[in-house]
Amino acid sequence: MAQDQNHLIWLDMEMTGLQPDSDRIIEIAIVITDSQLNTVAEAPVIAVHQPDSVLDAMDEWNRNTHGKSGLTDRVKASLIGEADAEAQMLAFLQQHVPAHTSPMCGNSICQDRRFMARYMPHLEAWFHYRNLDVSTLKELAKRWRPEVYKGVEKKGKHEALADIRESIAELRHYRDNFLRLVP
């Protein structure tokens, strides 16, 4: 498939916590959409291997959430480290989107970008410096149009691919119910 500079790269990662200095990436997923938010391609979801010492250091919320979803077991069983995960995701992106053209898209995406800058810097460098953060619209709708904000249904599975799909659906909801698109 040819690269398209108008495609959007949606990314989500699950981490062992919120601090890039001490926590690590344990799952990564990427979805490519066209500019109208239609899915073009999905990368294989990667559980990123981390040693037991990293997993044992997770706080209770992360232990429970990632344990219940099965992610902790998938991370332990994975043979793919951070460098290999980064290389696989870069190879996927090179098929679909030219470097430096797509903003990093997602929900609270700056958090993912912080981890990526530290642990997957080549992947982070593929993106445009801008972010398309759905949480910005969420915060505005919450304050300006609460009925639109309340219309978003989220399951909050904290699984990378499911979270991306929810973010895309959420942006569609805001596009259709909050933003006025005049031709």
UniProtKB/Swiss-Prot annotation:
TM stretches of this protein: none
Keyword Nuclease attached: yes
Active site: residue positions = Y129
What UniProt keywords apply to this chain's record, in alphabetical order?
Cytoplasm, Exonuclease, Hydrolase, Nuclease
Gene3D superfamilies xrefs = Ribonuclease H-like superfamily/Ribonuclease H (3.30.420.10)
Which InterPro entries does UniProt cross-reference here?
Answer: Exonuclease_RNaseT/DNA_pol3, Oligoribonuclease, RNaseH-like_sf, RNaseH_sf
Question: Matching CDD domains, A to Z?
Answer: Orn
Q: Which GO terms describe its biological process?
A: DNA metabolic process
Q: Does the keyword Metal-binding apply?
A: no
- Quote the EC number: 3.1.15.-
Location of the Exonuclease domain: 8-171
Example GO molecular function term?
Answer: nucleic acid binding
- GO CC annotations, alphabetized: cytoplasm
What family is reported?
Answer: Belongs to the oligoribonuclease family.
The record describes the protein's role as: 3'-to-5' exoribonuclease specific for small oligoribonucleotides.
Output this protein's name. Answer: Oligoribonuclease
